[in-house]
A protein has these predicted regions:
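Glutamate identity and glutamate-enriched acidic tracts
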Residues: 18, 48, 89, 97, ...
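Glycine/proline-rich, flexible active-site/cofactor-binding loop segments
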Residues: 23, 50-135
Length: 200
């Protein structure tokens, strides 16, 4: 952390870093003319469900007293604001008129996507729980988890998040959502590989 300069409490940093995308999406949805159309409204709820958990629940489940570099937090804020704008603008403003009708909710892509979304969310939440319960109080050593999805992949939490966003992209067929999938992969895959190499 010292090489990154100023830092903040990790829990506070997570809230400040993740909450902007929740708020940006809320603002864009509320000011759109399609906010209560069934499909856009459901897209909004799914997106916000993820980020409510990530912004306002996940940070307070963290253990330990680590700190987050201020620079990392600010970079996260910028990315999340831009991502929120990209996702919300497409879903509520730029999508072709008549694309997201009620009939969208009966398409195969919607149902496949929503199944993937909740499978990914379940994997992500369970994997986070496994990590939180790895160490006993006072133990500062690092361990590679062996439960749940960790039996098959090195970073079950990252895998779950990637599956979740693939599901969101499939259920919306949104170009913006697919861009986010690519970014998520580009961000998480190297981190997962680094963890794998560390414990090899």
């Amino acid at each position: 952390t010292p090489k990154w300069g100023l830092s903040v409490n990790n829990k506070l940093g997570w809230v400040l870093m993740e909450a902007p995308v929740f708020l940006v999406m809320l603002y864009l949805w509320w000011n759109s003319s399609v906010r209560f159309d069934a499909a856009p409204f459901l897209f909004f709820l799914l997106f916000e469900l993820h980020y409510f958990q990530r912004s306002f629940l996940f940070p307070f489940l963290m253990k330990g007293k680590s700190r987050m570099p201020l620079a990392i937090m600010l970079m996260g804020v910028v990315f999340n604001v831009l991502n929120g704008l990209m996702q919300g603008e497409w879903l509520f403003y730029l999508a072709p008129e008549g694309l997201y009708t009620d009939a969208w909710l009966s398409t195969p892509s919607f149902w496949l996507g929503i199944i993937l979304f909740f499978i990914g969310m379940g994997i992500n939440l369970h994997s986070d729980s496994v990590i939180r319960h790895l160490r006993k109080p006072g133990d500062t050593r690092h361990y590679l988890p062996q439960k749940g999805m960790y039996r098959y992949v090195t970073s079950g939490n990252y895998f779950g998040e990637l599956v979740e966003w693939i599901g969101f992209a499939v259920l919306t067929c949104s170009p913006a959502a697919w861009v986010f999938v690519l970014w998520t992969f580009a961000n998480l895959a190297p981190r997962a590989n680094s963890i794998r190499n560390r414990y090899r």
